[in-house]
């Protein structure tokens, strides 16, 4: 039987919900076989982040040049910064049979849905908006005005969770990690995915 094409896993949610923390927890697990697609951004690097590991950090001018060259699956401007997903790595890795894991903003996920309708979309939600605000304040990296801007944006994003296949509440990082891994495992066992492989196999037998 031919190698199964990889699954595109899209994790997104409001800023401050813990997407990066959950993603790191998933990739610390030695059983994880997903390939992480590193996003590109123009925002400033935070303490502890590494260029080329957490994000590819670019200037606004560099990012806009890549937009003109159509080098992104998706890109979005969020609170004054660009975020985007380089296209070629994702396509090549899926064709090799690997699952590709994207951690992106909600606006970006909407664009991916149009280009990759068969992708798996998971919305990471906070236990409450008050909890989200506390996390943003706890970062200590942004002004009160910017924090309020992110909370207001989060309200709109939570209303868009109906665009996703699954919602995982990040009340505890380890639990959120386990839920996401279980969702991916179940997705690979869906009848539609298994049936397509067997239909192809049966056609080859008839030749």
UniProtKB/Swiss-Prot annotation:
Residues 6-185 form the Guanylate kinase-like domain. This is Guanylate kinase. Its EC number is 2.7.4.8. InterPro entries: GK/Ca_channel_bsu (IPR008145), Guanylate_kin-like_dom (IPR008144), Guanylate_kinase (IPR017665), Guanylate_kinase_CS (IPR020590), P-loop_NTPase (IPR027417). NCBIfam families: guanyl_kin (TIGR03263). CDD domains: GMPK. One of its GO terms (molecular function) is guanylate kinase activity. Essential for recycling GMP and indirectly, cGMP. ATP binds at residues 13-20. Its main location: cytoplasm. It comes from the Bacteria. It catalyses: GMP + ATP = GDP + ADP. It comes from Staphylococcus epidermidis (strain ATCC 12228 / FDA PCI 1200). It is found in: Cytoplasm.
